[in-house]
Regions:
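PLP-dependent enzyme catalytic core of the Aspartate aminotransferase-like
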Residues: 140-141, 148-158, 164-204
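Active-site pre-lysine segment of PLP-dependent enzymes
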Residues: 1-10, 15-50, 63
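A short linear hydrophobic-aromatic micro-motif
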Residues: 120-124, 156-161
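Helix C-cap/helix->beta junction micro-motif
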Residues: 3-7, 119, 154, 195
Length: 204
């Protein structure tokens, strides 16, 4: 923020995961709470679990919002009244919905942490915020090949890190059903045992 203030710059911040901080029931501050030239975006699709509504919002300086509204008239014009009604219901019950989202993430992060403590071929820095992380596997196998082999042989599927330019990693989401995550990780560990003597330290 200090750097942006020095050069009178805008800051654009996507706060789509704001509200699932598993260490606190309080919302952490928004960039817009600290800087008058911050532009923040949020939607109902992630932490509120209503992706089908395709609705969100932007908060920022008035001159930016005026330009956004002008452009919006060309692209969208308006959303459906039923979508608007459902969105209002979601926001009226946001505390209940956000608590549910936090509880799911908290539970599944603990499951992942316990699994990582027992799995020698995989490591990860579990994020404080958000609903996804990247598992680093200690094998010299390209991630696309790794994921394809795993899926064909076990049915367990990860998005390969190469899709995000992070090789030797697997994208992992915390929002699945607890039972599915537990069973998937158990199956994954059993499959990994064939590589126990191939573990290497990949330099990233």
């Amino acid at each position: 923020i200090k750097l942006a203030q020095k050069y009178d710059c805008y800051i654009l911040c996507d706060e789509i995961y704001r509200g699932v901080d598993t260490e606190s029931l309080e919302l952490y501050p928004s960039f817009s709470d600290y800087y008058d030239k911050a532009i923040v975006t949020q939607s109902l699709s992630k932490v509120f679990s209503f992706a089908g509504l395709r609705l969100g919002w932007i908060k920022g300086p008035q001159e930016v919002i005026d330009l956004v509204n002008y452009r919006r008239d060309y692209h969208i014009i308006s959303s459906g009244p039923l979508d608007d009604y459902l969105a209002c219901l979601v926001l009226e019950n946001k505390d209940v919905i956000l608590k549910r989202s936090r509880d799911i993430c908290q539970t599944n992060k603990l499951i992942l942490k316990k699994w990582l403590d027992q799995e020698p071929l995989v490591s990860c820095v579990i994020p404080r915020h958000g609903t996804v992380c990247f598992l680093h596997y200690h094998l010299d196998i390209p991630s696309a090949e790794f994921c394809e082999k795993l899926q064909k042989e076990t049915g367990v599927f990860f998005v390969p890190g190469s899709a995000f330019d992070i090789e030797y990693h697997l994208r992992f989401g915390f929002t699945q059903d607890e039972k599915i995550i537990k069973e998937g990780l158990i199956t994954f560990s059993k499959w990994l045992r064939q590589f126990d003597h191939q573990s290497i330290d990949i330099q990233l």
